[in-house]
């Protein structure tokens, strides 16, 4: 499969990016990027999501292990280049059952937890492992010394089990964390006083340490309202800073990271402002924690995941998520504390949407529970916010100097137009120099259908390299919104196969084919960005070798005549990819390419008009220079009905 031939840069950009009406009254923004001027490391601190199963939590397995969630996690894990790495999950310990035998003490059944963690690992994801829940309601009071000791043994047993199952190198990457939001007192049937919470914390800490000192543990994962509110949050910090360890009697208890929850109330900058105020107070009260990593592992723009909001359906949400990331990497000068760059920033948006709001809840995918087929089945669509995570994944580890100005005035990241830019130095023959410039146009939760922002982007300092090319990817509502297509189709409750095909055609950004980069090392693009929108410029030198092989190809059933293919790019070795070529063979002998738009997402729904899906599949990467990599190992698929039994919606209204 070969990328389309290069076109004149001006005409190509007009075709792809100037579809918006001209913003006659607006002065243009000027974006300058210097590829020769690296500022600092750019860590991908945003690669996390999360969700909560519904009540009753003792039946969390019905949600966590449901077919719907298996599909959802396939989508989450299919973000290219590890663009989402962690799924922070509430009530994990409710997946364990406990039994007490005379003379034997407590014994545990880990079958459901094994299944969920296996599912994450299959999708190359890590758990954000909250030590939350009471197996079979055996733990009720953490001021009871016997229960505290038993809890330590449970945590140690759990950690040893998964070190043995997966290896320490994998489990040591997990973020073990306290019970979620302890000051909200969602403990189900567990009595949790301040002292009980501190005893619980020490039992978790020492249980993990007994399994391996390499395991990471932090908390408290809550709002940290100013004292005297949030007593468990502040009490835990006081305990870890000055208190006595329940088990060892030593002063001070380890706290590997401080996790807090600050959401935006509809504002991007409000997230950062709250974080800065809280962290400044923590560092003032507890100076030993000045260098302790800070996580905001629920940093959503708005509380209430199930609350339907039109902006959550389309590129408005996607652009706002990118804007929040940029504000954390480049804090506005007026906000002072530039030292606060969180070690982790997570959106809590891996929930499953439910009827009648498939697109407008705080989710990465849109779920349709299609009940007019026999048997009923589930379909997911990729929302623009999930595609935005794929664009963020194209950023690399060296942040470049970049500046946005308008009318001669330099603008910080708390404005409508912003930028993140990065560069990468090669690490092998399948790798080469590259640079990424990611522009956002975002007015937070507000969309302006008739407004476009004129922008001039100037990139300079690009070094000479073999086969140097550039590619643009644009994400906006007119062309890249499955929700918009759904509305144009009349908002069908049970879309047909053809309607799903039309909605999926809007999932990917609009890609302009690779073009030669100017020999001068400078490039100027004049564009008009829809408000909201994202625009990514990717500049790549040609590696010595073509891409490596696609691995882990799987086929998952959806319904008659439709199959989901998902694969891994872990051995592909290059980010400068134009598409994945997917080939199908009904007889396992003669393979033909499947016709589709260019896409580098590691997932594809095959839904041919012929409805013939039984056969063999293979996939290979194609780079910007039209060089294919090796095919994956083929996978053979025989059509079978997908599992049924859709899960209930989650109950966590304030998440």
Swiss-Prot record:
Its EC number is 3.2.1.76. Disulfide bonds join 540-576. One of its GO terms (biological process) is dermatan sulfate proteoglycan catabolic process. It catalyses: Hydrolysis of unsulfated alpha-L-iduronosidic linkages in dermatan sulfate. Alpha-D-mannopyranose binds at residues 53, 55, 57, 305. Alpha-L-iduronate binds at residues 90, 180-181, 263, 298, 304, 348, 362. The active site is at 181 (proton donor), 298 (nucleophile). Keywords: Disulfide bond, Glycoprotein, Glycosidase, Hydrolase, Lysosome, Signal. It is an enzyme of class 3 (hydrolase). PROSITE patterns: GLYCOSYL_HYDROL_F39 (PS01027). Monomer. Belongs to the glycosyl hydrolase 39 family. This is Alpha-L-iduronidase. It comes from Canis lupus familiaris (Dog).
